[in-house]
Regions:
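Dinucleotide-binding Rossmann-like beta1-alpha1 core, especially the glycine-rich loop
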Residues: 83-162
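Helical element adjacent to the flavin cofactor pocket in flavoenzyme catalytic cores
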Residues: 148, 173-233
Length: 440
């Protein structure tokens, strides 16, 4: 029997956590039965299980993960919960699609806010908005397109010049920025662990339980794990690009690795070298070449930059070390006054990308469902995708299902080695086009 690949990062999540945050559950040992099995405890899997359990509290639902929620890819992102689409287009149809997308993202934020508030999840939730910044004036056309999109969507924003950005961010690296309210910043490891911890009672969670195979049999499904099997009526795949190794359909998404580093907390002396600053988050005008930055409530800087193909979900220690060197050079370029601030940890995580930006969402086959193809910025997006998939699977009437379906479906991706060559070429092209937005 051929088994699926298991995601593996040769590094540890860098977000500050205590033992209680980890929410460790036992691994599966033995053979069990359930009405539903959910594979993956990220934002889509957790929201799907939560909604399924609330629709029918009599269902028995099993959720498994190859790791635990607090160390999974969903815990490894930069902690931005974004409620606005970036790209709209010029036609009436494209504007309508963007408005639908905004409605989905904002409903995802509302659901997260409700759950965090209800269960008092300590995830450092801060509604502070975000900055979208350019380094080089040659990126002006891209920034102007973003302004035009915000105006079309009738969204509030503020334009800032380099000096104004310095007062907000403490760096003179950027020549221009756009501030938009409404973006939430969190510690994503604490958030996803808290969401998994507070699932309804009819959801049973198993950690360190990778799904090695998924088969349809006898009017149901069978999931093979390291030390057991799960037989269920139906299955939901919340495994993003690795779903192709479990699902009976063609590949439509690829896995990319991104890297982040976090500094030690700044000392009072080091903070004196900066303007008085509150927590903030910054996204670059070019997401592949540029750097995402954050300044946290406990006086740390986070740097997210560099993207590698990770088509089999594996990131090596060597790749992580290379990213750490880049991050330190980048941080010192942005903040020359903080040469004595060390990076405390560097880690990686994977995102799923599709060729046309559309999700992989819906029913893959009889009794098998999925919500994948997050294309980055997936906290709010995958939360609502999981909720709506549960509504669709259970025959619930929800007008946002149509909005989700309007996003389309991801295009076909070729198998390796053609996929490997295509992904490497696309990354090289994006880095070249955005080379002036690379700080180092």
């Amino acid at each position: 029997m051929r088994f699926a690949s298991v995601p593996f990062n040769q590094n540890q999540v860098g977000w500050p956590l205590n033992e209680e945050d980890l929410y460790r559950q036992p691994s599966l040992s033995g053979d069990i039965k359930a009405d539903w099995v959910v594979i993956g405890s990220g934002y889509a899997g957790v929201s799907f299980a939560r909604r399924l359990a609330s629709i029918n509290p009599q269902l028995s639902i099993v959720l498994i993960d190859a790791e635990c929620a607090a160390t999974s890819s969903s815990a490894r992102n930069s902690g931005f919960i974004i409620g606005l689409p970036h790209n709209i287009g010029s036609s009436t149809a494209e504007l309508k699609k963007a408005q639908d997308y905004r409605a989905l993202l904002q409903e995802g934020i509302r659901q997260l806010d409700d759950t965090v508030t209800k269960h008092q999840i300590d995830c450092e939730w801060e509604n502070v908005g975000k900055y979208h910044c350019q380094i080089d004036p040659s990126s002006e056309a891209i920034m102007q397109e973003y302004v035009d999109n915000l105006q079309l969507m009738q969204e509030p924003y503020s334009l800032l010049n380099g000096e104004e950005l310095y007062q907000k961010l403490g760096t003179r690296l950027y020549s221009k920025g756009i501030y938009t309210p409404g973006c939430i910043l969190v510690n994503p490891a604490k958030l996803i662990a808290g969401l998994a911890r507070h699932l309804p009672d009819n959801v049973t969670v198993f950690h360190q339980t990778p799904a090695l195979a998924l088969h349809q049999e006898n009017g149901g499904v069978r999931v093979t794990t390291l030390q057991g099997t799960i037989r269920a009526d139906q299955a939901m795949l919340a495994t993003n690009a690795l779903s192709r190794e479990l699902s009976p359909t063609v590949s439509r998404q690829a896995s990319m690795a991104t890297y982040a580093s976090i500094t030690a907390p700044l000392t009072p002396d080091q903070r004196q070298r900066l303007p008085a600053m509150e927590s903030w988050g910054l996204t670059p005008v070019n997401a592949i070449a540029g750097a995402t930055l954050r300044y946290t409530h406990d006086y740390r800087f986070l740097v997210r930059q560099h993207v590698d193909p990770a088509l089999r979900g594996v990131i090596t220690a060597g790749q992580t070390a290379n990213a750490a060197r880049q991050h330190l050079a980048l941080f010192h370029t942005a903040y020359p006054q903080l040469q004595d601030v060390p990076l405390e940890r560097t880690w990686s995580g994977t995102i799923s990308v599709t060729r046309n930006g559309a999700p992989v969402w819906g029913r893959l086959a009889p009794r098998i469902w999925t919500a994948g193809g997050c294309n980055g910025a997936g906290v709010s997006k995958q939360t609502i995708a999981g909720t709506l998939l549960a509504d669709l699977a259970m025959g619930q009437d929800n007008p946002l299902i149509a909005a989700m379906q309007s996003l389309g479906q991801a295009n076909f991706m070729p198998p390796s080695p053609f996929l490997d060559i295509g992904v490497a070429g696309a990354l090289w092209k994006e880095r070249y086009m955005g080379r002036k937005e690379m700080p180092v």
